């Protein structure tokens, strides 16, 4: 469904979907859906807006998945600032973490939710609402050849982060090595 959503937003096999997220269920969906529909670019949510914008520009990201404004988190605000400096981003998909809370906390979030003054021109949509509209099987032919499936940024210790390409085969190999040599069925891992 996530891959179909990204394709419905104009993402082709060589287009980039970036996500600026903490670890949550939707992070895995954005990772796998982005790599299936096009090229996925995970971005560290702890980077400052200028660094995130540099990664978005360097990867030519067209869609960004991030959090909806949430109490005690600045991920949404930081990402909105970055998107303002990344002119090729045409859509921002937001994830509301309130869905993970139970009453009474879930009742308080709408009252405490910080404002997120958006200064960018990208269309803002709800990730889960839009994904629910999609088919559960791919609406497009999956590419059967090895290709760039992910763009990961470096730490940026000597300036702005640089981007490293990862092929589908490399991602699969890393998963195999991890499951064979490093981890057991008791471990929880997001790969790559």
Segments predicted by a language model, with ranges:
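Well-ordered alpha-helical segments embedded in enzymatic catalytic cores
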Residues: 1, 26, 51-54, 170-177
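Conserved AMP-binding/adenylate-forming
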Residues: 2-50, 189-192
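Conserved adenylate-forming
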Residues: 6-11, 134-147, 151-192
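Structural core segment of the AMP-binding/adenylate-forming
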Residues: 8-9, 39-129
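Conserved acidic residues
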Residues: 15, 53, 62, 90, ...
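Short beta->alpha linker loops
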Residues: 22-23, 47, 70, 74, ...
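Short amphipathic alpha-helical segments
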Residues: 30-32, 76-80, 106, 166, ...
